[in-house]
Amino acid sequence: MARHRNVRGYNYDEDFEDDDLYGQSVEDDYCISPSTAAQFIYSRRDKPSVEPVEEYDYEDLKESSNSVSNHQLSGFDQARLYSCLDHMREVLGDAVPDEILIEAVLKNKFDVQKALSGVLEQDRVQSLKDKNEATVSTGKIAKGKPVDSQTSRSESEIVPKVAKMTVSGKKQTMGFEVPGVSSEENGHSFHTPQKGPPIEDAIASSDVLETASKSANPPHTIQASEEQSSTPAPVKKSGKLRQQIDVKAELEKRQGGKQLLNLVVIGHVDAGKSTLMGHMLYLLGNINKRTMHKYEQESKKAGKASFAYAWVLDETGEERERGVTMDVGMTKFETTTKVITLMDAPGHKDFIPNMITGAAQADVAVLVVDASRGEFEAGFETGGQTREHGLLVRSLGVTQLAVAVNKMDQVNWQQERFQEITGKLGHFLKQAGFKESDVGFIPTSGLSGENLITRSQSSELTKWYKGLCLLEQIDSFKPPQRSIDKPFRLCVSDVFKDQGSGFCITGKIEAGYIQTGDRLLAMPPNETCTVKGITLHDEPVDWAAAGDHVSLTLVGMDIIKINVGCIFCGPKVPIKACTRFRARILIFNIEIPITKGFPVLLHYQTVSEPAVIKRLISVLNKSTGEVTKKKPKFLTKGQNALVELQTQRPIALELYKDFKELGRFMLRYGGSTIAAGVVTEIKE
């Protein structure tokens, strides 16, 4: 208990003899110099005064968010409005309130360029009024008393105004306005004051300078700021400027007068497609000798010496190891009058979907057949890919064909063998829909390079063949009419992440044209983005047109939302996305009749989508298109019918009558092509 007594009897007053001053680091009793205290001691009494933090005003934010809701708009119109606002914000920044921008967009019916012009015109009028008032007040001060040399420096001296010069009738912004040179604004003359002399002297000297400049350079005149503001500074390319570009003239200028042609090489597996085109590229100089020597050495080590030229187009290790093309290889070469985009399609039956992707992007085709005994028959008879490839390219819109009868050196350039092959193939191609005048037959040898870029000098061939070589036949193809004037359409064939911001897509522009800075809409994801860059044949360009195979760098969209098969279009004229549509189809050779509920694989451009035939509407006459039978129970080979299809996921389609390139598709079942069709009606 002794400890408790000690605690109870403790005198606490001894601990509180002095008051503690918490506002100081040490007590005043300690001796310390003022300099040391100022250096090491902190005093709250000397704390600097801090202004109260200004609270953020959220009223303006609420007003801007509610400004759109005040206007009763549909969901689609709201999306268009937000898109227009984003575009205008990129040009104007935050200088103009949202309400003014919204009113301008609605007043001009969602036309961004007209709305921008209206807002800029309104700002110009207001700024001119302010300048006029400032001019009048400055004139009054000048008449009253001379301006002191120290106070006469106006804002126009500190921040020089840009003066617009007219050179030979063209408006160009050239330099800054020199102090002392007058510029007329809205009928009032404003003179920048100078140091030293009064304003009257400055006016006199400026008049002398102005007359001297006019006499020395008559075509060069300083325009009023009204002309400058009537054509606002192009912060971003406007749609009006883009529409003024003559795309056809620019296209010819870019290609040096040569026309663009997309060529696909098709044929049965092991017919020699890659070797034929690889050797042609080497002879044209597209592949240097050092690279070709490297391919020859590597192919010899792999035990595939005859595949050296094929390795020019078969770039992946798996393709070189197996000796089979698996994906579409793409490259470029030039002829006398054409710029050719070459697509080497796979010939193996397992890779028909990839072949359809390449053929859907082609304008013309080269069909390669093997002239060896037994090989041509194997590829041409049932189960071979020669027939199927010929039907596919014709169904996908290819009307011009060059048939390269390859490996003729293995049959000693026999004329009888060549005529036998051309007779069988010519009859089949005529049935498939090719005109005789649009089909050419050329005897070639891909390994030796005979009759590829120059006419053969071999006596065994020249004694009976006097026709064109393969390159001359390709050069004689007629390029199709490009849909440059139609709305922009691009089908995605590949998506990948590149260095830097955004991501890249590749594909062929089917219609219209595009420039950097354009906004695009992706369907069916229904997402918008901006074109940051355009690459054509591995070279950056500012624009591209229909027929070009391009790579676009996009920003403002997540890469996860874009898949192979998506179609990019302009936001003003979007493409429709649906799961149900009606189509007119032509049935090929099938063993099982097509009935209601028949499952198929739909191949459309770069899309491969499972589908079901929901309805058999009618059977049509092949020639006239008239209905011969309504609501048939089944369809057999050779019939032309109107059916309704339904896909599992939405796909972006166009009617065949509007866009022929985007209105064709193929139907496959069980590893073989059973029908080709065109879209006639799109259901919701």
UniProtKB/Swiss-Prot annotation:
The keyword NADP does not apply. GTP binds at residues 267-274, 406-409, 445-447. It is found in: Cytoplasm. GO terms for cellular component: cytosol; cytosolic ribosome; Dom34-Hbs1 complex; extracellular exosome; membrane. Keywords: Acetylation, Cytoplasm, Elongation factor, GTP-binding, Hydrolase, Nucleotide-binding, Phosphoprotein, Protein biosynthesis, Translation regulation. Residues 344-347 are annotated as: G3. The modification Phosphoserine is found at residues 49, 67, 117, 127, 152, 154. The modification Phosphothreonine is found at residue 231. This is HBS1-like protein. The gene is HBS1L.
